[in-house]
Amino acid sequence: MIDIQLLGLLNATLQAATLLFVAALGELITEKSGILNLGVEGMISVGAVAGFMTAVNTNNIFLAVIVGVLSSSAFASIHAVVTVVLKQDQTVSGLILTILGLALSSLIGKNYVGKKLDTKLESLFSIDDPSNILQVLLSQNIIFYVAILLMIVVSYTLKNTMFGRRLEAVGEDSKAADSMGLNVTKTQFIATCLGGAFAGLSGVYLTLSYVPYWTDNMTAGRGWIALALVIFGGWKPYRTALGALLFGFLEALVPRLQTYGFELNPYIVKIAPYIITILILVLLTIYKGGKTGAPKNIGTPFFRENR
């Protein structure tokens, strides 16, 4: 029999990892096209509040998920217009998107702070007290399984489909891709909006399952961790998933150390997972000799030459 505390740690790890991985996977798609989006934090927040408001007002979880995903994707389209169409600085646009997303979600969600959901994303299988690893896996809600499916689909798409090859070509050398007849603007626009949709799904998971309520700034820097996970995973879906599991484990473990007799400052408990993540990224970069595997054109706007 596995210790109940270890099963609780595993359950908390999977929940934290799911939230991070979905957002990171969306950012991976966006960056594969050569677009850097630092607005993930704001997009998660927009999806979270939109989904929560819809769930409170309609009691329809399916509709809440759809609204959250579409709202975040629409919000990401602002970044697409600014950076892909208008060719403006991607870093500045992303930072503004984060600030705007957090402020906007706080504004429209102020009347929903403290409200409770009558219904939320439930586990796919009704297992109240898991007693083994299999039951822990089966007790997760549907977005956990969707995340696994998305990982497989995205990995296959990037390697084996025309859309994946277009993303790769545009992200590595947009001018060469354009010369071959690929529509660089369209590809980058779609990739950016897809990234927003994934961030919205992460936000919906946050407010409809992970912590089923709404309050200001509840994303708590998870968008930035998602960005770091893309780098950690070398722009590979499976490696990014492993990174999400690692950070999810750290996020779940640190608060539990106190139950094992470790006396920790509460501020240290809050920031420890983020500090450890930064250290891992630094060590990984040093180990790789500074080579991260990033798309060569990332962050560089595409200007079509006259032909």
Report residues per predicted region:
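Transmembrane helix-bundle core of multi-pass membrane transporters
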Residues: 90, 101-160, 262-269, 295-307
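Short loop segments and helix-boundary regions at transmembrane helix junctions
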Residues: 32-36, 77-128, 220-221, 225-238
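Transmembrane alpha-helical segments in multi-pass inner-membrane proteins
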Residues: 213-274
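Helix-loop-helix "hairpin" substructures at the membrane interface of multi-pass membrane proteins
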Residues: 136-214, 237-242
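Single transmembrane alpha-helix segments in multi-pass membrane proteins
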Residues: 8-57, 65, 70, 74-91, ...
